[in-house]
């Protein structure tokens, strides 16, 4: 990667979700500043798991992590494709659907075989946008 990375810090997960709601179709990437697991304190209130869950809701995924300093990392999020879903992220997506947090944009990139199974079970109804 050449040049300086433009990064963003969100005060909380609600603000990250708001950014995704507005930008998930317009932007091609964002680099979030997130605390490392070993970092103490609460100066950064969006943590990796929260950031990933909100991203999945809008059809985005994390792709690269770069150290920023001793306590923070840069994490790149981009729109995701339908293939190459890990079992962990499929389970996470199902849980987000149960919680009614998954948006139409998030459902559109679910693996086709998973969508077929969910339709048979009647579990792909409209959820929060």
Each model region followed by its residue ranges:
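Charge-dense, helix-prone N-terminal extensions
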Residues: 1-129
């Amino acid at each position: 990667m050449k040049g300086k990375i433009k990064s963003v810090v969100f005060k909380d997960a609600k603000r990250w979700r708001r950014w995704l709601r507005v930008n998930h179709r317009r932007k091609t990437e964002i680099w979030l500043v997130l605390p490392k697991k070993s970092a103490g304190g609460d100066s950064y209130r969006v943590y990796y798991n929260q950031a990933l869950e909100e991203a999945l809701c809008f059809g985005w995924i994390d792709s690269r992590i770069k150290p920023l300093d001793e306590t923070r990392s840069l994490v790149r999020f981009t729109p995701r494709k339908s293939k190459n879903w890990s079992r962990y992220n499929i389970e996470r997506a199902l849980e987000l659907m149960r919680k009614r947090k998954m948006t139409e944009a998030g459902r559109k990139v679910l693996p086709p075989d998973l969508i077929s199974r969910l339709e048979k079970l009647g579990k792909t109804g409209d959820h929060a946008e």
